[in-house]
Amino acid sequence: MKKVVDINWLEQHLDDPELVILDASQSTSVNKQENAIQGKYIPGSHPFSLQEFSDQKSELPNTLPTPEYFERKCRDLGINSTSKIVVYDNAGVYWSPRVWWLFHVMGHEEVAVLNGGLSAWIKANQATTESLSQANQPGNFKANFNKELVKSIQDINQNLTSQSFHVVDARSKGRFDGTAPEPREGLKSGHIPNSLNIPYEDVLNEGYFKSPDKLKELFKHTSSEETLTFSCGSGLTACIVSLAHSLISDKISPVYDGSWTEWAQSGSPINTKES
């Protein structure tokens, strides 16, 4: 299954009994901006709340749940081990790559993001519905945790010395340089030492992933042999850039799950443009 599919692909596969469509839309973005499309869904979509599919006991936002919890929630949605999953959101491409990454972490590779999201579907005059679907019966989804796709703060700290992988930060240049504030109150801006900045907005064009040639240009300072790890503010937009990289490298790189929210409040080293 392709990592990213377009509306034509989805339209042609709507009758596939193995297809599961997940709506990962949110009413507001991380910076509190209201998303334009509300109350419209692709027919047959099931609700996928990133808040529900996160560690409910963590003080950090969006962190990974346990495999057992993830498995149970997926079964509640009627997802099977053989399901072909397409996920979309109402912000073009924003929330959905996190869901794509979550399924890969949990061992399910038959998952794709809808390029352009719900807005692309609506612009193509495709039918929408005002309600989400519920599962007719529980699924048999089985989680198989892939630890290779997740980095912890301990891994990142050890890498400051070992330099075994390169951290790519998906936050804005201002936040990375330490010249713009973080959206989360009390967090200092800046970046993990020796990291590279590729803002998530740079891999997108009006809610669609840029062409492979343009993505390759963005990653020109990394080599195909180099191991990358993606980070951002809370592990969300890092998944957008991770997915973009996978489109040109044919491999899926890990994400630092705690990301800057964890790093900046941990006492770990912080670099800025001036340091």
For each predicted feature, which ranges?
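Cytosolic catalytic domains that perform sulfur/thiol-centered chemistry
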Residues: 1-275
